Swiss-Prot record:
CDD domains: F-box_AtFBW1-like. InterPro entries: F-box-assoc_dom_typ1, F-box-assoc_interact_dom, F-box-like_dom_sf, F-box_dom, Gal_Oxase/kelch_b-propeller, SCF_F-box_component. The lineage of its organism: Eukaryota, Viridiplantae, Streptophyta, Embryophyta, Tracheophyta. It holds the Pfam family FBA_1. This is F-box protein At2g17830. It comes from Arabidopsis thaliana.
Length: 394
């Protein structure tokens, strides 16, 4: 009787192609032949294409969630109106620290680009790790000097698909000899060279709040930014090909008229090529969701309003006001709803909540579990798998 490892490569590839992409990591440990095939670039590309086709047909889709300082690849099903589900995928709920061989449960931020996740730890050293959850690959990245709690990060790639990480710090600090001293640092890490370099020609007249998370679309990262000496707000993009920031990009709403710092503005993506923006007014609690029709480092065009929600139309027992440094969201285009993640702070125990909001007053609140840490808000970002490999360092 033939055993699997003796089968011809073409037949073995056909069999393994039927294995769910998320299970490939377990397959690698079966034998060397399976391990080699599962890492073959053409095989992986085929797997990714099939996985995306299945996802389009399925009622479920996948997102990345961060809860209690852990990162989860999560399956979402919103088509059951009675009991929508957010289910962590068992083998991909966390990753191992290569140095210490234990699960990492101290992630403070996570960013997605091209199937890769950039995770920032909250330990004293603020370490960086890049993770491909499907392939179980990680790379821990050492700083050029040191990391800081106020650092802002982004992950992207240039026109040649070379992946890079941007670290920026633009803050004011009080020192005895130099009160309100400004520290402005911009650095780029290259996966190809495994090294950092300083970006020199940057002297911005704008700033980004440390709690405003960047969003990567088509390899470049976008932020909600504010003029340094005024109240003008806009988007700014870092182009990983030119390694420069682009011009100010327009918001879909009037960012100067009665705008306050308690208004909520947060970014998300739709698929791999569209930018989405959530705006909630602190004064009226009106929520608007906009989606781009065109997005690149020098130009952003906005489609018509995707969804506008008047708080008075929602049957809820208290004001639905998202926290300025939380309120992460994603759009389910099939169901035509927006799902916003936040924390219920009105109960004795803090609970992570998913608020499903649609047109004509459609609203549903889903309890996603207790939050053990008051300082950790549930974060979510869209996830699209890819065949990008994290080259292991020797």
């Amino acid at each position: 009787m033939a055993i699997m490892s003796d089968l011809p490569r073409d037949l073995l590839a056909e069999i393994l192609s039927r294995v769910p992409l998320a299970s490939l990591r377990s397959v690698r440990f079966t034998c060397k032949k399976w391990n080699d095939l599962s890492k073959d670039r053409s095989f992986l590309k085929k797997q990714i294409v099939e996985a995306k086709k299945k996802q389009l047909k399925s009622k479920e889709f996948e997102v990345i969630m961060m809860r209690n300082f852990r990162v989860y690849l999560t399956s979402v099903d919103l088509h059951n109106d009675v009991n929508p589900s957010f289910t962590p995928k068992g083998t991909l709920t966390s990753f191992s620290d290569d140095a210490n061989q234990h699960q990492v449960d101290n992630v403070s931020s996570v960013f997605h680009c091209d199937g890769l996740l950039l995770c920032i730890t909250k330990d004293l050293n603020f370490r960086l790790v890049v993770w491909n959850p499907y392939f179980g690959q990680t790379r821990w990245i050492q700083p050029r000097n040191s990391y800081h709690i106020k650092d802002i990060y982004a992950i992207g790639y240039d026109e040649n698909k070379n992946h890079k990480i941007l670290r920026l710090k633009d803050q004011y600090y009080d020192y005895d000899s130099h009160p309100r001293a400004r520290i402005c640092e911009f650095e780029l890490y290259s996966f190809e060279s495994n090294s950092w370099k300083v970006v020199l020609d940057v002297s911005p007249d704008w700033y980004i709040h440390s709690y405003h998370r960047g969003l990567s679309v088509k390899g470049n990262t976008y932020w909600y930014a504010t003029e340094k000496h005024g109240y003008v707000n806009f988007l700014i993009c870092f182009d990983f090909t030119t390694e420069k920031f682009g011009p100010r990009l327009p918001l879909p709403f009037n960012a100067t008229e009665s705008f306050t710092y308690d208004d909520v503005v947060t970014l998300s993506s739709v698929g791999e090529e569209q930018l989405a923006l959530l705006f909630q007014s602190d004064a009226t609690l009106m929520m608007e969701i906009w989606v781009t029709s065109k997005v690149d480092p020098t130009e952003v065009l906005w489609n018509k309003l995707f969804l506008a929600v008047d708080h008075d139309m929602i049957e809820f027992d208290y004001e639905l006001k998202f926290v300025a440094d939380a309120g992460s969201f994603f759009i389910d285009q099939k169901k035509n709803v927006v799902v916003v993640f936040d924390k219920d702070m009105n109960e004795h125990t803090h609970r992570g909540m998913a608020y499903i909001v649609g047109k004509n007053g459609y609203f549903k609140r889903v309890d996603i579990g207790e939050e053990a840490y008051t300082s950790c808000f549930p974060l979510v970002c869209s996830y699209v798998p890819s065949s990008v490999q994290i080259r292991q360092l020797t």
